[in-house]
Amino acid sequence: MVITVAKELPPAYEPEHIARALKLADVIAARAPAHDRDASFPFENFADLSREGLLALTVPAALGGIGAGARDTARVLGIIGKADPSTALVLSMHYIQHLVMARSTRWPGRLSRKLAKETVEGVALINALRVEPELGSPARGGLPATIARRTATGWRLSGTKIYSTGAPILKWYAVWAKTDEAETRVGLFLVPAGLPGTRIEETWDHLGLRASGSHTVVFDDVVFPLDSEIDVRKPDDWKVPDFTQSTVHAIFVAAIYDGVARAARDWLVTFLQERVPANLGAPLASLPRVQEVVGGIEARLAINARLIESFASDFDDGFQLTAIESNIIKLTVTNNAVKAVEDALQLTSNHGLSRTNPLERHYRDVLCGRVHTPQDDSTRVSAGRLALGV
């Protein structure tokens, strides 16, 4: 029995947006090898996603979007992640921002409505730019070096952001910066892409997720309006993370890497069914040892499906969840995904690591799950400290 997230309901009961994602998946998957090889950005994927209304998946229905919750969004990300995880990662960051807009009391309504309208009408993506060369990820603490200076006519922004996923296509940046006020505040400012003084340095040359366009964005005295504050507070007020941001980020990232493992599993099954070594005279799939390893892969993917489904459904139903719980699920799902692909490589020998076969690419992509925030060591330390009361 094969358990998948994408097709767990009879087709007649599938929401329309799931059907649209499934329809696009084959097209997106066909483009993935070339974009991976060239580290080129898949602009055409986002044009297709926009045409199908899927960029507005988490935009509230009242604002013209689909209004999907975490469960359906995780399913879409799993489908697209299986086809091309680079595209799915950019998409996930965009989805998270619109979920936060819809649920946060801190996002200015005028700004969230403007961005919702643009997303419904065209290709208008947003991502949070947070990571810096010296700071690393702010998830581990510390103040950003990027600074917003207040003037009579607008904010003036200077700083450098690295690993800015989707940089080639983003229309909006939610930039993590500190102010130059007498009492420093820190938080997010909404900055339009392409303003004078902004430049993208194409620094992303990674082992995996090569088509995600996670380049460096440099702000050199960039001017933007004073009313573009999203959420700027005293540093101590950020000790408790935004609930929506922290929980859905972890589960959406997990869904993407689970999708990668499912792509690897599908290729493996076909390979084992078709590969007939001369000394065996039968497909590799006939060997008990092979069946056992594939069964182990199925077990890991079945666990992943249940974890993602149950957690996302609980979030949608309003259950009280914690960031630590979501981080543990991300840790478990991504490590299951990595192990599933490693087991697939074990069965395929040189074939699996050949660049003519997709398993090599899936392996490079799935390894990124181990370094993607929240990282495993941080999750374990947080869970351990909570259990020990320290």
Predicted regions and their residues:
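Glycine-rich beta->alpha junctions and the first turn(s) of the following alpha-helix
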Residues: H206-R300
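Glycine-rich flavin
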Residues: F43-R51, L57-T160, T165
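A short core secondary-structure module
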Residues: T160-I200
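C-terminal helix-coil-helix/basic helical segment that borders enzyme active sites and/or dimer interfaces
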Residues: P33-D36, A302-T332, L345-L353
